[in-house]
Amino acid sequence: MIPVVALVGRPNVGKSTLFNRLTRTRDALVADFPGLTRDRKYGRAFLSGYEFIVVDTGGIDGTEEGIETKMAEQSLAAIEEADVVLFMTDARAGLTAADLSIAQHLRSRQKTTFVVANKIDGIDADSACAEFWSLGLGEVYQMAAAQGRGVTNMIEYALTPYAEAMGIERQGEEEEVDERQYTEEEAEAEQKRLQDLPIKLAIIGKPNVGKSTLTNRILGEERVVVYDEPGTTRDSIYIPMERDGREYVIIDTAGVRRRSKVHEVIEKFSVIKTLKAVEDANVVLLIIDAREGVAEQDLGLLGFALNAGRALVIAVNKWDGIDQGIKDRVKSELDRRLGFIDFARIHFISALHGTGVGHLFESIEEAYDSATRRVSTSMLTRIMQMSQDDHQPPLVNGRRVKLKYAHAGGYNPPIVVIHGNQVSKLPDSYKRYMMNYFRRSLKVVGTPIQLRFQEGDNPFENKVEKLTMSQERRRKRALSHIKDRKTK
């Protein structure tokens, strides 16, 4: 499971600066969730080979009263759910009462914590950082987040204990990043193997949208004995089930928790828990409340799923009991605001009464099969050639862009790598045309498809040709002949 790093500290110590630097390293999707909290941000980051979720917390002013306020609860929740806490302080301002208060709270939680003395640029860092040892949280790490000094070393040190686990996880997900070039027979055999694997389904949505109701409806219909292994208080519940001969694992993010161990605010909605579920899933089922329409939180969650490249099914819940005028308005809003994901199936359901729930699994299975389908190199190259025959690539500087061959570059989501000359100069309109052509030809439904173009560089370009011995002799005779003619 991908580790979570929480940035904790009093206001203006550089949490947001570090957050922005970390998330920029991978063009990561960064989303604020209006209505959830105004001072907590989430992003995916990649640095020095480590992939992780980073959380920018806020709202802790360090006072005893401030720790207990509603405003601070979401930040405290981030600490509870994090694997690693970076406790950030201001080396220029020195140790404050707020720092001491936050440190006391962190010690009581017994979290893996690293004290970071930020803003060390232009000062005597060793001298300025000495007093932070009194926080009682171990070694003090020096950093200048704005300039990037010390950031990489800090992350490498903090995430080293997770390196082996992440390596094992990547091996376990080998089928999702498989770049082998299959023959027709190999692709068919691999596809058959994948049919026997359980489909991991994450059910996500904003608070009170009906996640628990839908989960219970699904399990009740199938009469499956549910077992859970909660582990720590931040783990989602994995529920195995079978439907129509196909095995599934439902990743429940609805908030099944040991209530005595966590804040009530965590029960309702945990973005971190949702992010982890999305990362671990094959297919994401996003639930939208029909009575509220498409909210900003829905778009934020949708962005997380798309950023992770997961197959997607959308369920509009609470469809029963609303009049036709509202239904027409909701459908119009879905077309307008979700037009960019026209590949995803949309279902209108009632989780409470079971209306339309059964049809969800047809789309879930369809999306999984599309996302994990193995396609041979010869098939992809044929489709690429047909797309060119139907619509020639444009001319660039008087020369036609030439596409040579295509092969698979990964799965979940499907990635097609196309090799050719001058492909970097292809206009976006032609790339979209090709993407849609591949989608129609492969009948890809419920998952984004990505095209990557690689330039077929001339291996002899800028290379001095080495002559053979016979060529060298002919060259000398020719030069001698030219020289003799000039002297006559």
From Swiss-Prot:
Binding residues for GTP 1, per the UniProt record?
A: 9-16, 56-60, 118-121
State one Pfam family annotation. KH_dom-like
Q: Which residues form the KH-like domain?
A: 373-457
> Binding of GTP 2: at which residues?
205-212, 252-256, 317-320
Among CDD domains, the record links this protein to:
EngA1, EngA2
Domain EngA-type G, residue spans: 3-166, 199-372
Q: Which UniProt keywords apply?
A: GTP-binding, Nucleotide-binding, Repeat, Ribosome biogenesis
Swiss-Prot/TrEMBL GO biological process terms: ribosome biogenesis
A single Gene Ontology MF term assigned here is: ribosome binding
InterPro entries linked to this entry? G_ENGA, GTP-bd, GTPase_Der, KH_dom-like, KH_dom-like_a/b, P-loop_NTPase, Small_GTP-bd
Q: How does it assemble?
A: Associates with the 50S ribosomal subunit.
Q: Which family does it belong to?
A: Belongs to the TRAFAC class TrmE-Era-EngA-EngB-Septin-like GTPase superfamily. EngA (Der) GTPase family.
Q: What does this protein do?
A: GTPase that plays an essential role in the late steps of ribosome biogenesis.
Report the protein name in the record: GTPase Der
Q: Encoded by which gene?
A: der
